[in-house]
Amino acid sequence: MTTTEKKDRRLEWGLVTLILVLLVLIVGFVTVMYRSNRPYAQAEEEATAIAKKYTDLTKVSDFYWFTRDETYFSLLGADKKGNEIAVIVPKDGNKVTVLNQKDGVSELAAMQNVAKAYPKEKVKQAKLGIYKEAPVWEVTTTSDSGKVNYVLVSFDKGEEIKKVSDI
């Protein structure tokens, strides 16, 4: 075997090794991502099943995992008649709350209200849930210093209920 053939052979083995290492890394990454998202997906599946048991929900457009004093799973979607509804399911599955979306402020409106009230903060997301027995949007913002803030906005009127700052 000539020197050139030996170099070619080493190069081939190097490429095979590199491909195998990359393949193992990709499979590992996909496995970790799947396992980390599984609790969220399972909560969505269970909340959807409970919501369909208590309502005529046929289509789910959004899912929220909300935790304040208690944990709630909220679904936005449409019923059999095409009405836009929100279904809020407590973690224990009891006392499901059903809201007509038209009777309250939307996620976007809640986020816009917070952005207007706190122009120096960056609005990140909103989640629907229950706080002190009333439906609320929990709007998450960040300050210039990177601190996280939570603003609770009433679903009914879009008014600020509470702000938790600098977490």
Descriptions of predicted regions:
Residues M1-K7:
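N-terminal Lys/Arg-rich, disordered targeting/topogenic segments
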